[in-house]
């Protein structure tokens, strides 16, 4: 089954996810879905990211149902960063951002993005894991980046598509996954709901 309808719901406020989906030719209606993003005891980064993507999709679908909106696929995603078993979410403040960037300096870490699509009773999840290798960062570079304000709404305190791109020596995996929505996995998921991309 394929569909000519390019409309989906997006349970995310991320401008990067919106931009990626629009570049794929999709038309989006944003759904606000709040969930508790606390890490559970013993939960690893992949399990955590997949759970949050699934819970965001479920919460978004409840909004669609309770508001009587037309049924169409709803996409949600979650991104986290992990290094040596530690989960790095969005920094709480400048000190937290500084701690994260120092941890990544001269080392690799993983950017993990899980994507969930829900339509009716069907919910599917796919995950992208990318190894990101940072150059060694000077204190001055870290301070300039923090002063830019860019780290504060991003998992791991950086955005690869922004000023922090200069910190990245190379990646092994999905660039769009590090941005917050892996195009390959997203297209595979949407194909399961009848979308033919591109």
Curated annotation (Swiss-Prot):
Its EC number is 3.6.1.9. HAMAP family: Maf. Its main location: cytoplasm. The record marks 16, 79, 161 as: Important for substrate specificity. Belongs to the Maf family. YhdE subfamily. The lineage of its organism: Bacteria, Pseudomonadati, Pseudomonadota, Betaproteobacteria, Neisseriales. GO terms for biological process: nucleotide metabolic process. Keywords: Cytoplasm, Hydrolase, Nucleotide metabolism. Nucleoside triphosphate pyrophosphatase that hydrolyzes dTTP and UTP. May have a dual role in cell division arrest and in preventing the incorporation of modified nucleotides into cellular nucleic acids. GO terms for cellular component: cytoplasm. InterPro entries: ITPase-like_fam, Maf-like. It is found in: Cytoplasm. It comes from Chromobacterium violaceum (strain ATCC 12472 / DSM 30191 / JCM 1249 / CCUG 213 / NBRC 12614 / NCIMB 9131 / NCTC 9757 / MK). It comes from the Bacteria. GO terms for molecular function: dTTP diphosphatase activity; UTP diphosphatase activity. It catalyses: dTTP + H2O = dTMP + diphosphate + H(+); UTP + H2O = UMP + diphosphate + H(+). The active site is at 78 (proton acceptor). This is dTTP/UTP pyrophosphatase. Its cofactor is a divalent metal cation. It holds the Pfam family Maf. CDD domains: Maf. SUPFAM superfamilies: ITPase-like (SSF52972).
């Amino acid at each position: 089954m394929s569909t000519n309808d390019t409309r989906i719901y997006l349970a995310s406020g991320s401008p990067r996810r919106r931009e990626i989906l629009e570049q794929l030719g999709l038309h989006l209606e944003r759904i606000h879905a709040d969930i508790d993003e606390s890490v559970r005891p013993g939960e690893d980064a992949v399990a955590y990211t997949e759970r949050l993507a699934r819970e965001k999709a479920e919460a978004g679908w409840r909004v669609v149902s309770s508001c009587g909106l037309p049924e169409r696929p709803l996409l949600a995603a979650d991104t986290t960063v992990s290094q040596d078993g530690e989960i790095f979410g969005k920094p709480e403040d400048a000190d937290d951002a500084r701690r994260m960037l120092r941890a990544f300096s001269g080392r690799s870490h993983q950017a993990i993005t899980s994507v969930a699509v829900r339509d009716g009773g069907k919910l599917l999840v796919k995950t992208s894991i990318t190894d990101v290798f940072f150059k060694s960062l000077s204190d001055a570079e870290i301070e300039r980046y923090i002063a830019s304000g860019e780290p504060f709404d991003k998992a791991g305190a950086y955005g690869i598509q922004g000023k922090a791109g200069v910190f990245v020596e190379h990646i092994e995996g999905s660039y769009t996954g590090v941005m917050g929505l892996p195009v390959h996995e997203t297209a595979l998921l949407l194909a399961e709901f009848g979308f033919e991309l591109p």
